[in-house]
Amino acid sequence: MRLAVICFCLFGIASSLPVKVTDSGSSEEKLYSLHPDPIATWLVPDPSQKQNLLAPQNAVSSEEKDDFKQETLPSNSNESHDHMDDDDDDDDDDGDHAESEDSVDSDESDESHHSDESDETVTASTQADTFTPIVPTVDVPNGRGDSLAYGLRSKSRSFQVSDEQYPDATDEDLTSHMKSGESKESLDVIPVAQLLSMPSDQDNNGKGSHESSQLDEPSLETHRLEHSKESQESADQSDVIDSQASSKASLEHQSHKFHSHKDKLVLDPKSKEDDRYLKFRISHELESSSSEVN
């Protein structure tokens, strides 16, 4: 309730305040309403003054057209315009002098624009004549980690003997030359590899010799792998044979026990139930052992 009362009070105060009427008229209309007589005379132009102002402009425009038809260069036309402007300035009043200068300045600006466009076309043509050729780049394997090996491989692949260098050479000569070049390259590569693979300590020497032997003789590794596979196969076969022999021995031993026990049962006819139980047990053991062997 308090808020509602406060809002109504504010609305009442706002409505009681005086409202100013906005004046939508322009500044000229305001001045005219305040001072009607002098401003009306200033705003309404005199027709005689208009004719005096337009006459020199028409004369200058006609003379400019004639000069433009007769002369082609912009510099001469500018000079003629300057002379004509001087004559007009001597004849006209101060107001006419200012307006004629404005018209001449506008004409000179137009001509300067035309001259600038002509200069731009000339410079564009000269720039178009000069054309720089595009030079292709060549990929060089510099900065690579395997630059030495990469360069040697590229040399060995791109080594070709042309007929122009050796016109009288035969195929045999070319092949011998190729072989000699490859042998030279291999001889050059061997000391570099030796220097790179040379360690500082004796342990490193042993490891380096072992690695070099592995690299030089890859057949040893394959032979070792084959030998290890053969040894594993032979061990597996021997284990199978041993298991079979042991199973056979156990079966024989159990059968021997069974026969001996059977003989005892024949001698002792009172223990028939025990014999049945033993037979069932022995048969079960035999079946389990046979299943294990299989």
Swiss-Prot record:
Phosphoserine modified-residue sites: 24, 26-27, 61-62, 75, 77, 80, 106, 109, 112, 115, 118, 176, 180, 200, 209, 213, 219, 228, 231, 234, 238, 243, 247, 250, 255, 260, 271, 283, 288, 290-291
One GO process term, biological-process aspect: intracellular chloride ion homeostasis
MF (Gene Ontology): cytokine activity; extracellular matrix binding; integrin binding
Bias (Polar residues): 48-61, 121-130, 197-216, 234-249
Keywords associated with the record: Biomineralization, Cell adhesion, Cytokine, Glycoprotein, Phosphoprotein, Proteoglycan, Secreted, Sialic acid, Signal
Biased composition (Acidic residues): 85-110
Cellular localization per UniProt: Secreted
GO cellular component, one term: cytoplasm
Modified residues (Phosphothreonine): T170, T175, T222
Signal peptide range in chain numbering: 1-16
PROSITE patterns: OSTEOPONTIN
Pfam families: Osteopontin
Annotated motif Cell attachment site, positions: 144-146
UniProt entry tagged with the keyword Signal: yes
InterPro entries: Osteopontin, Osteopontin_CS
Biased composition (Basic and acidic residues): 174-187, 220-232, 263-274
Post-translational modification: Extensively phosphorylated by FAM20C in the extracellular medium at multiple sites within the S-x-E/pS motif. The phosphorylated form inhibits hydroxyapatite crystallization. Dephosphorylation via a mechanism involving ALPL/TNAP promotes hydroxyapatite crystallization.
Region (Disordered): 42-274
Annotated glycan sites: T123, T132, T137, S219, S288
Domain of life of the source: Eukaryota
Family: Belongs to the osteopontin family.
Annotated function: Major non-collagenous bone protein that binds tightly to hydroxyapatite. Appears to form an integral part of the mineralized matrix. Probably important to cell-matrix interaction.
Record text on subunit structure and interactions: Interacts (via N-terminus) with integrin ITGA9:ITGB1.
PANTHER family according to UniProt: OSTEOPONTIN (PTHR10607:SF1)
Name recorded for this polypeptide: Osteopontin
